[in-house]
Design a protein with these regions (language model features):
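Peripheral, non-transmembrane regulatory/ligand-interaction domains of membrane transport proteins
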Residues: 1-143
Length: 143
């Protein structure tokens, strides 16, 4: 599922398609066609979008053709928890910065992104560095 958000008249509203200065949030359920459309439409390497699908993906920063990828690991409760499993696991969040948009890609339901979304009012997606810091802040608060 793909959501598009934009700040209009000091309010964050969900819109139907990406525009300049939008936040694009990709969350489960994920479809390969959506990744292909985003990759082509926003000129993003496809592997930047699919890296969040690998639960073992390592935190890192990468840049290709003026598109920046930030992968962070965030702790979350293990939904398949049993006696032999850890209560918490870490899952990747991919943050992709293009010239015109910021994207977050999650392959799992992520409480940190939900908290970020709930406090997103009056944020400006065009201020990408501040948005990245706010995502980091919500990850830390969630842990």
């Amino acid at each position: 599922m793909i959501q598009y958000f934009k700040n209009i008249n000091q309010q964050t509203v969900e819109i139907d398609k990406p525009e300049i200065g939008t936040w694009v949030n990709v969350l489960p359920p994920l479809k390969q066609e959506e990744f292909s459309e985003l990759s082509t439409g926003l000129d993003i390497p496809i592997d930047f979008l699919t890296d969040s699908l690998d639960i073992d993906e390592r935190s890192r920063f990468e840049e290709e053709d003026n598109v920046k990828l930030i992968v962070i690991k965030t702790p979350t409760e293990n939904n398949s928890f049993n006696e032999s499993d850890a209560y918490y696991i870490t899952i990747p969040i991919c943050i992709i910065l293009t010239h015109n948009q910021i994207l977050t890609v999650n392959s799992f339901d992520n409480p940190a992104i939900k908290k970020f979304l709930n406090t997103f009012q009056n944020r400006h997606p065009d201020k990408k560095n501040m948005m990245v810091l706010k995502v980091f802040e919500k990850v830390v608060q969630n842990y």
